[in-house]
């Protein structure tokens, strides 16, 4: 007669233990809203964190905290001797998310891989014209010209045939624009005349399943119980959007979030002194820059661009925004840790008299006004956008140039910059794959000028030829020599003011474990948990 109460007591005890060790939700304070959830339509790191790193996977991936390419949805691959064919062998048993709006009937297979690339490659594909903005990253990277075909060999094998050798191809395949979608889900949406849901109700194979998005407030996910690398330790992931880095820090201290992305560099010492907090940091592959719209009056003249460059005090800018040791003044469009960095190039000295002379020679009337677009909140490449804009405004006033500062929400700024509405725009880039091509082709190529990702609207044939040749070279020494020449052309023609290469910081509560800061500035929380 005592057995039933004993069993009940044991059951209650087990339930108590289970409740006690239940995984806690992870709340991450992030700096901006994602542009959308159809990853291939967008290019920003904010969107990649909220979409590519949570919802989707790719054939290959980067080992956490490094730029080493490792298997992901493909568990192996073969490369032909001529370097023109890549055959990917897919991992078996990978499942797409089951949601209230999609119930997959099969595992991920070659049809999904082919669909994901053909949609971007083939103008006759039924989904190709449904993207209102095209496929900016795919196009800027030159993949339209690079990919000859993407073919299904069998259910678990896909063959990519290239038109030329491409040294960074495997690294490119690990990037956000190469995310793999469910062809079955896409077919379901097309038949139901709900194509827009691909961008609003995403489905992938990634560590987290999308639940809902409250614009400019938060994105909510739940852990994927079927994730091929194992269910994430956090039962839920919440991205809490706070554009002000001071607000993100306040929320972290109040335990309203357990991770705060991109704190201000000058807040780092006080964060490190707080017993309840800790900081992860490393040198990042970034560049912050001012792009000058070479399609606009006056800005099309290299003398004007040179004048603006030598009138602006970049050293003062870096010191004011980043503090000592947290960033270096940039010379070239990518940092010196990457292949082919040209160490022979230097910044010209600041020279207001020469700047005035160049402006006069170019016929720019004193008092001419240029617009400068900047964002309303700080991020990894620009922790204090308004201060930086005001410093430029003050410096250029000394040479007779007025700056009309236009502060706007991140997504709005990108949209208007892509449309070419700016004279200048304060922007930044974080390398996606550890290769110099990832800085030069997406932001400075002629193709990127056409689709608006090249905010300078700069298309230089000599520069284009050099970076095209470099991509096709396998020998690192030969590639490096070509990149050094490309940087010389860039500096001679001055489409940007290269501002800074930064150090990356992430602040978190002491009870957060399993987070890996990345030199690529991506944030993946598949292994992160709150203890």
Language model: regions and residue ranges:
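Structural transition elements
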Residues: 208, 299, 328-362, 379-387
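Ligand-site clamp/hinge motif
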Residues: 193-199, 224-270, 281
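Aromatic- and charge-enriched surface segment that lines or borders ligand/interaction sites
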Residues: 75-127, 159, 251, 298
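Detector for C-terminal structural segments
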Residues: 24-30, 50, 167, 214, ...
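A structural "hinge/loop" feature
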Residues: 33-50, 73, 100-104, 167-179, ...
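N-terminal lobe/hinge region of extracytoplasmic solute-binding protein
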Residues: 29-81, 118, 125, 201-205
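A bilobed periplasmic-binding-protein/Venus flytrap-type ligand-binding module shared by bacterial periplasmic
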Residues: 222-225, 284-307, 311, 320, ...
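Surface-exposed binding/hinge segments that line
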Residues: 89, 112, 121-186
